[in-house]
């Protein structure tokens, strides 16, 4: 039984980061740091949550090991995608500046408009697999919701992309996490009553 705490945390962190970034764009201000750095900070409690949950497990099944590797692969994939995107931005920045200098206006192509679909594609994969493997429909549908939003964000502006990313985090992780946590509490009460 997963406690759901990790899913709640990641759903909240990604939703908050997306909504704060949207607010920065909408209202024309800038925080002194990139709000998405909170995701790096969130790795620390995730490690502690994972260690605590592993200690509470009496037996580690094949399914548990399989899920651990799926989510580890997801984390590595996200890290690599961020690295690739930052590498592309480091090359694209000077090209865009030169274009502006030569033409007198910004390039009609904005690379950041195409980042959200990539993240939503990745968000959906382990979420969908976990939901299907664990027969937990809220997470299965959350993964599917990420993929629908992935397709939509190809055709929308960055502001809509950020709203859909926040909605995806809520649908894929926050709500399923809350439901898992509720089931976990019920399970723990039942286990406690059996050992009385």
Residue ranges and their predicted role:
Residues 2, 27-34, 59-66, 104-115, ...:
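Membrane-interfacial loop-to-transmembrane-helix junctions in polytopic alpha-helical membrane proteins
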Residues 2-88:
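Selected alpha-helical membrane-embedding segments in polytopic membrane proteins
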Residues 4-11, 75, 117-120, 124, ...:
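Residues within membrane-spanning alpha-helices of integral membrane proteins
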Residues 10-24, 43-49, 109-120, 160-168, ...:
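Hydrophobic alpha-helical transmembrane segments
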Residues 13-17, 41, 45, 123-126, ...:
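Membrane-embedded alpha-helical transmembrane segments of multi-pass integral membrane proteins
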Residues 22, 26-30, 54-58, 90-98, ...:
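Transmembrane helix-loop junctions in multipass membrane proteins, especially transporters and channels
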Residues 70, 74-139:
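Membrane-proximal helix-loop-helix units in multi-pass membrane proteins
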Residues 126-196:
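Terminal transmembrane helical module of multi-pass membrane proteins
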């Amino acid at each position: 039984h997963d406690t759901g705490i990790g899913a709640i945390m990641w759903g909240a962190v990604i939703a908050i980061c997306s909504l704060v970034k949207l607010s920065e764009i909408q209202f024309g201000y800038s925080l002194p740091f990139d709000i998405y750095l909170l995701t790096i900070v969130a790795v620390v409690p995730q490690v502690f949550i994972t260690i605590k949950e592993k200690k509470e497990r009496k037996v580690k099944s094949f399914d548990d090991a399989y899920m651990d590797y799926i989510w580890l692969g997801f984390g590595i994939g996200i890290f690599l995608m961020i690295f690739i995107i930052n590498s592309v931005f480091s090359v694209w920045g000077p090209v865009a500046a030169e274009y502006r200098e030569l033409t007198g206006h910004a390039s009609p192509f904005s690379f950041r408009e195409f980042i959200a679909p990539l993240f939503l594609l990745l968000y959906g994969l382990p979420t969908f697999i976990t939901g299907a493997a664990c027969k937990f429909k809220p997470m299965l549908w959350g993964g599917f919701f990420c993929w629908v939003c992935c397709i939509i964000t190809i055709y929308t502006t960055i502001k809509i992309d950020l709203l859909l990313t926040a909605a995806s985090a809520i649908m894929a992780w926050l709500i399923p996490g809350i439901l898992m946590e509720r089931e976990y509490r019920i399970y723990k009460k039942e286990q406690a009553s059996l050992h009385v």
